[in-house]
Amino acid sequence: MRITVLGYQSPYPGPNGATPGYLVETDSARILLDCGSGVLAQLGKYLPIYHLDALLLSHYHHDHVADVGVLQYGLMVHQLFSQRPKDKPLPIYAPTQPSANSQALPYKQATTFHPIDETIQINVGDMQISFLRTDHGDGDPCFAMRLEASGKVLVYGADSGPNTKWQGFANGADLFICEGTYLDQNKPEQPNGHLTVREAAQLAEELGCQSLLITHLFAEYEPEVVKSQAKDYQAGPCHIARIGLQIEL
């Protein structure tokens, strides 16, 4: 399993940057996790969009879905040019709510919508995927994702505050992609559906994850500052997200 960081910034992309998006590849599947602003421009460095097997959306906040409409339009054009069969729309797996967002996911013959929740398990190629609702604070659902293939486990934490029930879902993951939206110095007084870098590191350590990728960072953050606040994670390699970073499991 190979994970490529296509975007990691939030709430907006910095110069030459992109908000969240991760390409996950195995021998038989190519999946995009979230599709934020600038993600498609990065995806093209590794894969034509018409070779994607599925798109999984954690939730509908703009920084995670900004490029979805462009992806839909691009796939439609590639179908017109016979680069992707018209009878092979791209499945988009995403929450049902807000309904206005999920209803926009089917687009001509290019894309179809498939609902996700904690009761659903899907298979894409050799990947088995399950979901966990996270503590993201504003009432609309957000789902973490657990991807399993060839004995390896990737957990994408999406957006999450401190009250997500990770036990039994992320324990011992080979890689935990965990948000660290805030540094110590800009942490809000009350939790608002996000974690600090320090909290992300402590969480991964408590869960016994084999490696950690800290993401969902302001474009202005200096990587060495992020790294210094992640030192509580000692169980394995700690990666700080950057565009183009690839991790093999």
Task: Go through each PLM region and give its residues.
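Short acidic-hydrophobic, aromatic-tinged amphipathic segments that line or gate anion-handling sites
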Residues: 113-117, 240-241
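A short helix->loop->beta-strand "cap" motif at the edges of active sites that frequently abuts
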Residues: 29, 83-90, 207-211, 236
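Acidic/polar short surface loop at catalytic or gating sites that assists cofactor/ion binding
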Residues: 73-113
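Active-site neighborhood of phospho(di)ester-bond hydrolases with catalytic His/Asp-centered motifs
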Residues: 32-36, 53-60, 94-95, 154-160, ...
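Cap/insert and terminal regions of metallo-dependent hydrolase folds
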Residues: 162-245
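Active-site metal-binding motif and surrounding structural segment of the metallo-beta-lactamase
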Residues: 38-88
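Metal-dependent catalytic neighborhoods of phosphoester/phosphodiester hydrolases
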Residues: 67-75, 101-104, 222-230
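Core dinuclear metal-dependent hydrolase active-site scaffold
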Residues: 1-46, 115-168, 246-249
